[in-house]
Swiss-Prot record:
Domain of life (superkingdom): Bacteria
Subunit structure: Monomer. Binds 30S ribosomal subunits, but not 50S ribosomal subunits or 70S ribosomes.
Stored NCBIfam families: rbfA
Single GO MF descriptor: ribosomal small subunit binding
Keyword terms: Cytoplasm, Ribosome biogenesis
Name of the protein in its database record: Ribosome-binding factor A
HAMAP family: RbfA
Lineage: Bacteria, Bacillati, Bacillota, Bacilli, Lactobacillales
Function according to Swiss-Prot or TrEMBL: One of several proteins that assist in the late maturation steps of the functional core of the 30S ribosomal subunit. Associates with free 30S ribosomal subunits (but not with 30S subunits that are part of 70S ribosomes or polysomes). Required for efficient processing of 16S rRNA. May interact with the 5'-terminal helix region of 16S rRNA.
Signal peptide positions (record): none
Pfam families in UniProt: RBFA (PF02033)
Cell compartments where the protein resides: Cytoplasm
UniProt GO BP: maturation of SSU-rRNA
Length: 116
C-alpha cells in the first residue's frame, strides 16, 4: 500500500519537473505548447508513462510533437537526474492524452441530445 503512495508522489514530481523542463530547457520548436497531463509509474519506478496534450488536433502536428519528445528524452532524463533525488531515473514513454478530446466529444453529443 505504501508503495502505491510513493509511485503517485514520484509521478507527480516527474509531471511537474517535465513541464518545467519542456518550458525552460528544451528548445525544439516541435514541443512548444506541449502540456504534461499525467504520469503513471510502474510499481518499481523503472518506467514512467508520460501523457501529454497539444493545442492542435492535426495528425501531422501530433506526429511532429511525438518525434520531438522522443528526441528530447535524453535532455529531459538528464535534467530529472539533476532535480530529483531518485536512485535511478525511470525510462520515459510519451503518450498522447486522448481524454480531453474524448471529453469534448461526449460534451458535443450531450449538447446534440439537448437540441433534439
Amino acid at each position: 500500500m505504501a508503495n502505491h503512495f510513493r509511485t503517485d508522489r514520484v509521478g507527480m514530481e516527474i509531471k511537474r519537473e517535465v513541464n518545467e523542463i519542456l518550458q525552460k530547457k528544451v528548445r525544439d520548436p516541435r514541443v512548444q505548447g506541449v502540456t504534461i497531463t499525467d504520469v503513471q509509474m510502474l510499481g518499481d519506478l523503472s518506467v514512467a508513462k508520460v501523457y501529454y496534450t497539444i493545442l492542435s488536433n492535426l495528425a501531422s502536428d501530433n506526429q511532429k510533437v511525438q518525434i520531438g519528445l522522443e528526441k528530447a528524452t535524453g535532455t529531459i532524463k538528464r535534467e530529472l537526474g539533476r532535480n530529483l533525488k531518485l536512485y535511478k531515473i525511470p525510462d520515459l514513454t510519451f503518450v498522447k492524452d486522448e481524454s480531453i478530446e474524448y471529453g469534448n466529444k461526449i460534451d458535443e453529443m450531450l449538447r446534440n441530445l439537448d437540441k433534439n
